């Protein structure tokens, strides 16, 4: 059973006085120069989530992941040795895409331009009319591999040739505190995407506060995350863990959805306020509802720089804020 922990309310600025209490600078949200610095200093160095191991159930499986941030896509494969690898989806001959399908199963890849073939391990296996080339060395012409590692079934890549940190080091306490959550028992129920005309940090920031809930979500989740005891939906807890952060969201225990609302919320991250999970003693990872508050609903965990998991007791959902540069008046 989860042990109740009674702690005095502590604000984020009390824990981290270095954050200050003044207005937030705005240059980082609109200056093209700042954005270019972010690409080099952050996104080319950070570990980024590209998928789940369940997308590669057996050898021969593959999927593509678009990286609009950099204008290319990544090919993620499971080879005969069962190892998961990632490659630039680019033929080493003339730079053509070698695979056009978003996902599938195959024995290898053949470039549709000149027929160069590669194994699922990225090795160059065949070159038509290889005698017509001078000094061709297949061992040096395989697909360009990208650093890859797995955390709790999530596949991460790093675009640095030699990443400065391992994935475990990069995730740090945030990753350690969430080990054991039953991600592998989940079933993907839906996926959606949208284009939002804003800086990528605006999207991430919106998940890090619940101040907007009573207004923006007044026709949907307002009554689940705000109520007479907490009319503005203030957070229970907020913590910084290295570059990552997590927020515990309050839940209205008095809320009872009508049948239509219950159906709409059926595939949302399961809040304890409707399942009674905290009362029933569902075992949670250390980092989920860290204060063990009985009126807890969900945690919003933000993995730097742009990956978010909304986690309840029974379901979770992931959000990624992708980047596409468009600057203008």
Residue ranges of each PLM-predicted region?
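C-terminal catalytic domain of Rieske-type non-heme iron oxygenases
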Residues: 3, 61, 83, 89, ...
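GGW-centered surface loops in extracellular recognition modules
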Residues: 329
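A noncatalytic interaction/capping subdomain that flanks phosphate/NTP-handling catalytic cores
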Residues: 1-2, 30
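Short, contiguous pre-domain boundary segments
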Residues: 6-26, 184
């Amino acid at each position: 059973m989860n042990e109740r922990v009674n702690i005095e309310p502590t604000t984020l600025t009390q824990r981290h006085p270095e954050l200050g209490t003044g207005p937030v600078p705005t240059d980082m949200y609109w200056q093209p120069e700042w954005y270019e610095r972010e690409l080099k200093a952050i996104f080319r160095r950070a570990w980024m989530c590209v998928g789940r191991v369940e997308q590669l159930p057996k050898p021969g499986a593959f999927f593509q992941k678009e990286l609009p941030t950099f204008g290319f896509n990544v090919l993620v494969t499971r080879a005969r040795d069962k190892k998961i690898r990632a490659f630039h989806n680019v033929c080493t001959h003339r730079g053509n895409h070698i695979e056009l399908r978003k996902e599938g199963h195959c024995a290898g890849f053949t470039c549709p331009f000149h027929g160069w073939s590669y194994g699922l391990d990225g090795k160059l296996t065949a070159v038509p009319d290889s005698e017509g080339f001078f000094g061709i060395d297949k061992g040096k012409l395989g697909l360009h591999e990208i650093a890859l590692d797995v955390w709790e079934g999530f596949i991460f890549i790093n675009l640095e040739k030699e990443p400065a940190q391992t994935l475990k080091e990069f995730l740090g306490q945030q990753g350690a505190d969430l080990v054991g959550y039953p991600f592998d028992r989940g079933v993907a129920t839906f996926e959606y995407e949208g284009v939002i005309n804003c800086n990528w940090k605006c999207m991430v920031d919106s998940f890090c506060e619940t101040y907007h809930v009573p207004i923006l979500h007044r026709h949907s989740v307002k009554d689940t995350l705000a109520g007479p005891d907490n009319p503005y939906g203030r957070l229970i807890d907020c913590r910084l863990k290295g570059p990552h952060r997590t927020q515990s969201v309050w839940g209205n225990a008095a809320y009872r959805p009508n049948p239509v609302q219950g159906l709409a919320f059926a595939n949302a991250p399961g809040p304890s306020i409707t399942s009674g999970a905290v009362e029933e003693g569902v075992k949670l990872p250390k980092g989920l509802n860290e204060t063990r508050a009985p009126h807890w609903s969900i945690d919003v965990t933000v993995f730097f720089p742009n990956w978010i998991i909304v986690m309840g007791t029974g379901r979770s959902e992931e959000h990624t804020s992708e980047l596409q540069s468009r600057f203008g008046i």
